[in-house]
Amino acid sequence: MDIKVHFHDFSHVRIDCEESTFHELRDFFSFEADGYRFNPRFRYGNWDGRIRLLDYNRLLPFGLVGQIKKFCDNFGYKAWIDPQINEKEELSRKDFDEWLSKLEIYSGNKRIEPHWYQKDAVFEGLVNRRRILNLPTSAGKSLIQALLARYYLENYEGKILIIVPTTALTTQMADDFVDYRLFSHAMIKKIGGGASKDDKYKNDAPVVVGTWQTVVKQPKEWFSQFGMMMNDECHLATGKSISSIISGLNNCMFKFGLSGSLRDGKANIMQYVGMFGEIFKPVTTSKLMEDGQVTELKINSIFLRYPDEFTTKLKGKTYQEEIKIITGLSKRNKWIAKLAIKLAQKDENAFVMFKHVSHGKAIFDLIKNEYDKVYYVSGEVDTETRNIMKTLAENGKGIIIVASYGVFSTGISVKNLHHVVLAHGVKSKIIVLQTIGRVLRKHGSKTIATVWDLIDSAGVKPKSANTKKKYVHLNYLLKHGIDRIQRYADEKFNYVMKTVNL
């Protein structure tokens, strides 16, 4: 046998093969890192820009075993794989459905039944003991995690670790588990920024929830108590911190990553798969809309067209310079403030999303001068204040929240939300999809959710009237806007394009 793959622990497998084959495998499991050209280590010749997932100790992330078969097929090798690696949970769909039917699950005071795609995700995860469960925002990922955790505690000894991206989500996840009536507060220990005084005394709690920033600081022996690990919003999980957490969880048989939008790029995908196993995507956002599970979505892609004189001056600026100039335009910010007020005056709630604090504060001040019910949220606003604003939006009408992408694009859930205005045009697929997800949650006060995507059209027009090209030069924010429209088309979202002359 050319390659032998041995079980090492629940985080890694060990490769046994000849030296020349090992180097071929190491190349096969190496990928160019995203943005490596901009990394100082690459620029100074200290790194070749590649991420290598097979290390010199011949250890490969557990989830990548399936890729070894592809390697063998491509290069004509034969492999033996330790049977322990492919062990599955002995659970039939019939037994799973029977177990699920006996659970009494609630949302508030109303008894609920998990949706078909939630059931499929839980079953797929349990049987395989690891999976990336890729479901759209608003598909009820916290219920999926609660059911996975409940099954584990009923059938295994050991604790469950849930990693979330923000302190606000630590509290939200714990509250959701209790709301479903699948767990009591005493069974859940919050650690780090989201913890309360009571959490100190919950050392026997079987479920531990914390941010990766808190978890990564724990001593190595702390990780040995966990038999199941779930990483919520796992698209934020690339990098050394999460890899070191996964490596510490070498006794942990069940590992799940949950996300609504995985990062593109082979290196990213392979890192996810290595940590959590294969990707399982049971449902799309467009299917959820079709089935009436989330609010219908309309995207207004508004091209803000600038005068020719301005576009010529903008040409040749760096990306950062362009952002600074455009977000600093008084006329543009006044237009955004006017739009937000107009939406709020219809008794509908609107979020205005910004990236840079100076831009957010400028928009907030313009709205505040004309309208009372406006609030500002960014990383500098503490979690408690954010939660108060979340409650205000959930229970109020005609409220405007000027919010940073960093705080509100990931995980904060407000159902009573009608409009999202993208005041800063971002390139990141993840931020765009997560932000859209915030507006899709169903609420009795809305039949349609609207995203206002502002695209700064400062392309330079050709001097000759005979040329077929509309623009001879595209500015960065226009290019990013066109990319977002392509993303909407890929996701089968309903979008319209309009032009507004500034």
Curated annotation (Swiss-Prot):
Record entry for activity regulation: Unwinding activity is strongly stimulated by single-stranded binding protein gp32, the ssDNA annealing activity is partially inhibited by gp32 and strongly inhibited by ATP-gamma-S. Another study did not find gp32 stimulation of helicase activity. Holliday junction (HJ) branch migration is inhibited by ATP-gamma-S.
Record-linked Pfam families: Helicase_C (PF00271), ResIII (PF04851), UvsW_N (PF21241)
Sequence ranges assigned to domain Helicase ATP-binding in this UniProt record: 122-280
Gene Ontology MF, one: DNA binding
Domain Helicase C-terminal: 335-501
Enzyme class: isomerase
This protein's UniProt keywords: ATP-binding, DNA-binding, Helicase, Hydrolase, Isomerase, Late protein, Nucleotide-binding
Extent of motif DEAH box: 232-235
Keyword Isomerase recorded: yes
Residues at which ATP binds: 135-142
Record's catalysed reaction(s): Couples ATP hydrolysis with the unwinding of duplex DNA by translocating in the 3'-5' direction; ATP + H2O = ADP + phosphate + H(+)
Cofactors demanded by this protein: Mg(2+)
Statement: the UniProt record of this protein carries the keyword Chaperone: no
InterPro entries associated with the record: Helicase/UvrB_N, Helicase_ATP-bd, Helicase_C-like, Helicase_Restrict-Modif_Enz, P-loop_NTPase, UvsW_N, UvsW_N_sf
Assigned EC number: 5.6.2.4
Subunit structure: Probably interacts with UvsW.1. Interacts with gp32.
PANTHER family in the cross-refs: ATP-DEPENDENT HELICASE IRC3-RELATED, TYPE I RESTRICTION ENZYME ECOKI R PROTEIN
Role noted for this protein: Plays important roles in recombination-dependent DNA repair and the reorganization of stalled replication forks during viral DNA synthesis. Active on in vivo-derived T4 DNA; viral DNA is highly modified by hydroxymethylation and glucosylation of cytosine residues. Helps process Holliday junction (HJ) intermediates to mature products by catalyzing branch migration. Probably able to catalyze replication fork regression. Unwinds HJ and Y-branched but not linear double-stranded (ds)DNA; unwinding requires ATP and Mg(2+).
UniProt name for this protein: ATP-dependent DNA helicase uvsW
